[in-house]
């Protein structure tokens, strides 16, 4: 074995050891089943209760530029800072080609407000896709049957996660978010809360608007700001520019850079950002869910007749890739 091959072999062993160390630490941090439901709760009407603070800083350090090169598939993480590299976290990455991996994911079924009813059977994996389906139930109050999938492992900054998602075409939030805590004390990053088919006739931009934000709550004192981005503002070369959330799969990502800086991504491009008014202090779980409420800020209540249409009532997740930023 010559010196070059020996160097490459040694580097490979180092990378493998680094990856294994990250996954081992995540396994240690995975929360037990008994604590999952207690770890996250939020009101369904928080948008009304916690308006954006106009005084909070917005991070403008990353914007789409005409001469930049982007991977529109979303498969490539953002360029790592000098002296750093991205290492994939297997516990928080999945192609969903081998069924529902119960070592990585759990169905966390606490309810939002009416009409939502979380049910285990309304989510699963088939044909290489994780899916969450909204169906019509018989309960007169909780008739919107749906589900939620959450990671067992937790993660902290600096990290990047990206998921390829096609939204259900009903008036509901198709979500991809990170959270840890309860209504009174929590850290939360909402990568998307997307609704391609608002029923209220009051959210004309929603089919293309990426609703992204953070919540930082301490003893019921809420700090919040949004970094919403419209996919019609993607670069002209991006084939997904102006394509509604239900029409094609899009990739949605977030680079959680440090205790305050959060950069969102859409189809490989920077897509809005926020700077938290308080330091994030918690390790977060990754979550997908699908839910509705009778409120204009969500886009209006889902129509019952849409829940019986299997062509539009299902959110589909093709894959998720999550990375930790480490020193080279």
UniProtKB/Swiss-Prot annotation:
<feature type="binding site">
    <location>
        <position position="224"/>
    </location>
    <ligand>
        <name>substrate</name>
    </ligand>
</feature>
<feature type="propeptide">
    <location>
        <begin position="18"/>
        <end position="67"/>
    </location>
</feature>
<protein>
    <recommendedName>
        <fullName>Beta-agarase C</fullName>
        <ecNumber>3.2.1.81</ecNumber>
    </recommendedName>
</protein>
<feature type="signal peptide">
    <location>
        <begin position="1"/>
        <end position="17"/>
    </location>
</feature>
<dbReference type="InterPro" id="IPR000757">
    <property type="entry name" value="GH16"/>
</dbReference>
<keyword id="KW-0732">Signal</keyword>
<feature type="active site" description="Proton donor">
    <location>
        <position position="193"/>
    </location>
</feature>
<feature type="compositionally biased region" description="Basic and acidic residues">
    <location>
        <begin position="26"/>
        <end position="45"/>
    </location>
</feature>
<keyword id="KW-0378">Hydrolase</keyword>
<comment type="similarity">
    <text>Belongs to the glycosyl hydrolase 16 family.</text>
</comment>
<feature type="active site" description="Nucleophile">
    <location>
        <position position="188"/>
    </location>
</feature>
<feature type="domain" description="GH16">
    <location>
        <begin position="70"/>
        <end position="328"/>
    </location>
</feature>
<keyword id="KW-0964">Secreted</keyword>
<feature type="binding site">
    <location>
        <begin position="119"/>
        <end position="129"/>
    </location>
    <ligand>
        <name>substrate</name>
    </ligand>
</feature>
<dbReference type="GO" id="GO:0033916">
    <property type="term" value="F:beta-agarase activity"/>
</dbReference>
<feature type="binding site">
    <location>
        <position position="188"/>
    </location>
    <ligand>
        <name>substrate</name>
    </ligand>
</feature>
<feature type="binding site">
    <location>
        <begin position="133"/>
        <end position="135"/>
    </location>
    <ligand>
        <name>substrate</name>
    </ligand>
</feature>
<feature type="compositionally biased region" description="Acidic residues">
    <location>
        <begin position="46"/>
        <end position="59"/>
    </location>
</feature>
<comment type="function">
    <text>Cleaves the beta-1,4-linkages between beta-D-galactose and alpha-L-3,6-anhydro-galactose residues in agarose. Cleaves agarose in a random manner with retention of the anomeric-bond configuration, producing beta-anomers that give rise progressively to alpha-anomers when mutarotation takes place.</text>
</comment>
<keyword id="KW-0326">Glycosidase</keyword>
<feature type="region of interest" description="Disordered">
    <location>
        <begin position="26"/>
        <end position="61"/>
    </location>
</feature>
<feature type="binding site">
    <location>
        <position position="110"/>
    </location>
    <ligand>
        <name>substrate</name>
    </ligand>
</feature>
<dbReference type="GO" id="GO:0005975">
    <property type="term" value="P:carbohydrate metabolic process"/>
</dbReference>
<dbReference type="InterPro" id="IPR013320">
    <property type="entry name" value="ConA-like_dom_sf"/>
</dbReference>
<feature type="binding site">
    <location>
        <position position="193"/>
    </location>
    <ligand>
        <name>substrate</name>
    </ligand>
</feature>
<dbReference type="GO" id="GO:0005576">
    <property type="term" value="C:extracellular region"/>
</dbReference>
